[in-house]
Swiss-Prot record:
UniProt name for this protein: Cobyric acid synthase
Matches recorded under InterPro entries: Class_I_gatase-like (IPR029062), CobQ/CobB/MinD/ParA_Nub-bd_dom (IPR002586), CobQ_GATase1 (IPR033949), CobQ_N (IPR047045), CobQ_synth (IPR004459), GATase_3 (IPR011698), P-loop_NTPase (IPR027417)
Protein family: Belongs to the CobB/CobQ family. CobQ subfamily.
Keywords per UniProt: Cobalamin biosynthesis, Glutamine amidotransferase
HAMAP family found in the cross-reference section: CobQ (MF_00028)
Phylogenetic classification of the source organism: Bacteria, Bacillati, Chloroflexota, Dehalococcoidia, Dehalococcoidales
Pathway, per record: Cofactor biosynthesis; adenosylcobalamin biosynthesis
GO molecular function: ABC-type vitamin B12 transporter activity; catalytic activity
Family annotation (Gene3D superfamilies): 3.40.50.880, P-loop containing nucleotide triphosphate hydrolases (3.40.50.300)
GO BP annotations listed: cobalamin biosynthetic process
Chain's role: Catalyzes amidations at positions B, D, E, and G on adenosylcobyrinic A,C-diamide. NH(2) groups are provided by glutamine, and one molecule of ATP is hydrogenolyzed for each amidation.
Active site, UniProt feature: 334 (nucleophile), 445
Every GATase cobBQ-type domain range: 254-453
């Protein structure tokens, strides 16, 4: 192909229609077909973040899409990241670094100034690849945002990207939403839409033909694919809707894991890998839903103090404390690790007006929020050797850190030794455990993608439970990307999509 990559864009009739997973699939298909491909989303509002090798933050979805492309994630793939915080404000990350925290109204005054930043990032990707697959956000028909949006039709028009419009048939009303979206677009914008993708279909696709005929007749835009509802895909999803589904491994499960669904939950895909090794992973938001799990996980959160307040207010805090007192294992990751401690301090009011709050007190630690955020990839080893980490001293771990808090240990024991970051050798401690090893905290996101660590961690729980250990399943996301690509390729007209890609906008 030419020096500047060709473009194709996936927009949707609303949030949660499956844009991210469709972009992931297209990225993998183009890679399978021998092209050098990269994903791009100019502006992403998400709590799921990833840290690149350079230490920059991007949306987790773009990191997944990059992985499907077979390339390392970069900040150019998501130059503007919005991370919602408490009090209707968002932290704005530009080119991987925190830029400011502002309200929604302030952001939409500010956003047009970031268009050049987004386009510069896109152009850098175009110079390095054959194809760039662009993802939109929400809907292009949000007429109240039309003048200030920089993620849907403004990107398509400025960059010259043909658009595939996706709709979710599973929730009903897909034909009304597709026709309504087209009707609300400006005439010039409509000319960019080259085809429809009907996503999340269950049943006999031939039954849709009468409705498809009406859709195509009314809009003069063809339906290019009907993609089935995807189940049991070990691929991280952008939207939290999929948290309602229990994730179980293949075959029988012998461990029950309850993840607390915090209001501002982040990086919830940290635990996908656990479901490949005989564990059921379910997200719970009420005390009555916890039951009697083998492990309670408190996940990451964008706003630790407001979510800690939530745990106290609805009784979840007391339930977790009682369960831990009776021997239930508890794990906290990032914000969840901070919640496990005795106190959380926010002297700079980074998260809210609350400057200090009592934690669960399950670890003898205290966390203080600082002004600077730590964002880095890490690798290291298990240091502690009891309970959840029994017989695992020296086991290699890896992942990435995103946090503004600094946690101080008192009688709690350090859990991990960090030995390397992208900057070179490192020598510092991470995480903490109680003496018995039944309560564990860490700042490392993605720690369970290590097969050996995951096996040892889950088998420690099995030994405590008195059931046989298991060999680790191989968490092969590469295989999952191929599976996704095969399903989507079989469901869409790739010949027509290649025609659209090559013709561009005419």
């Amino acid at each position: 192909m030419n020096a500047m990559a060709k473009l194709i864009m996936v927009q949707g009739t609303s949030s949660n229609v499956g844009k991210s997973i469709l972009v992931t699939a297209l990225c993998r298909i183009f890679k399978q077909d021998g092209y050098k491909v990269a994903p791009f989303k100019s502006q992403n509002m998400a709590l799921n973040a990833f840290v690149t090798q350079e230490g920059g933050e991007i949306g987790r979805a773009q990191a997944v899409q990059a992985e499907a492309c077979g390339i390392a994630p970069s900040v150019d793939m998501n130059p503007i990241l919005m991370k919602p915080e408490a009090d209707s404000k968002s932290q704005i990350v530009v080119n991987g670094k925190v830029d400011r925290t502002i309200s929604a109204r302030e952001y939409y005054e500010y956003a047009p100034l970031l268009l050049d930043t987004a386009l510069a990032a896109l152009n850098r990707l175009r110079e390095q690849n054959d194809i760039v697959v662009i993802e939109g956000a929400g809907s292009p028909a949000e007429i109240n945002l039309r003048q200030r949006e920089i993620v849907n039709m403004r990107i398509a028009k400025t960059a010259g990207a043909p658009v595939l419009l996706a709709g979710d048939i599973d929730r009903g009303g897909v034909f009304a939403s597709l026709i309504g979206t087209i009707d609300l677009l400006e005439p010039e914008e409509r000319s960019y839409v080259k085809g429809y993708l009907i996503n999340k279909f269950r049943g006999d696709a031939s039954l849709l033909k009468p409705a498809i005929d009406v859709l195509e007749d009314r809009t003069s835009i063809p339906v290019l694919g009907i993609i089935p509802y995807l189940r049991n895909m070990a691929i991280a999803q952008e939207d939290s809707v999929y948290l309602d589904e229990c994730k179980s491994g293949l075959g029988e499960t012998d461990l029950d894991i309850a993840v607390i669904r915090l209001p501002r939950i982040s990086n919830y895909d940290d635990f996908d890998a656990l479901a490949t090794d005989g564990a059921s992973v379910r997200f719970v938001s009420k005390t009555g839903e916890i039951g009697n799990p083998d492990l309670i996980i408190i996940p990451g959160t964008k706003s630790t103090i407001p979510d800690m307040e939530y745990l106290w207010q609805n009784g979840l805090a007391e339930t977790i404390i009682k369960k831990a007192g009776k021997g239930t294992h508890v794990l906290g990751v990032c914000g969840g690790y901070q919640i496990l401690g005795k106190m959380i301090y926010d002297p700079h009011k980074t998260e809210s007006e609350t400057t200090e709050l009592k934690g669960l007190g399950l670890l003898d630690t205290e966390t203080t929020f600082e002004k600077e955020k730590s964002t880095t990839q890490v690798s290291g080893q298990v240091r502690f050797n009891n309970g959840l980490l029994a017989d695992m001293a020296g086991c290699e771990v890896g992942g990435y850190e995103i946090h503004m808090g600094r946690t101080r240990l008192f009688t709690a024991q350090p859990a991990f030794q960090i030995t390397k970051t992208p900057k070179g050798p490192a020598d510092y401690l991470d995480g903490a455990s109680n003496a018995e090893g039944t309560v564990l905290g860490t700042y490392i996101h993605g720690i369970f993608e290590s097969d050996s660590f995951r096996r040892g961690f889950l088998n420690a729980i099995r030994r405590y439970k008195g059931i046989p250990e298991r060999q680790a399943g191989y968490f092969d996301r590469d295989k999952e990307y191929d599976k996704l690509a095969d399903i989507v390729r079989a469901s869409i007209d790739m010949n027509k999509i290649y025609d659209i890609l090559n013709e561009g906008i005419r």
